Amino acid sequence: HAGTYTSDVSSYLQDQAAKEFVSWLKTGRGRRD
């Protein structure tokens, strides 16, 4: 179960990081353009 929990947490963290990265791209690039 520990392995499953760890992989669930890392997929969650990767998902959050991806969403933050996408919104950073939208806001950051939008301001520059």
From Swiss-Prot:
The protein's matches in PANTHER family, at most eight in alphabetical order, are given as: GLUCAGON, PRO-GLUCAGON
Q: What does this protein do?
A: Promotes hydrolysis of glycogen and lipids, and raises the blood sugar level.
Q: One of this protein's Pfam families, by short name?
A: Hormone_2
Task: State the compartments where it is located.
Answer: Secreted
Molecular-function GO term, any one: glucagon receptor binding
Induction entry: Produced in the A cells of the islets of Langerhans in response to a drop in blood sugar concentration.
Cross-referenced InterPro entries: Glucagon, Glucagon_GIP_secretin_VIP
Q: Which GO terms describe its cellular component?
A: extracellular region
Alphabetical keyword list: Hormone, Secreted
Which superkingdom is the protein from? Eukaryota
- Gene3D superfamilies for the chain: 6.10.250.590
Q: What organism does the UniProt record list as the source?
A: Oreochromis niloticus (Nile tilapia)
Instruction: Report what the protein is called.
Output: Glucagon-2
Family named by the database record: Belongs to the glucagon family.
Sorted alphabetically, the Gene Ontology BP terms of this entry are: response to starvation
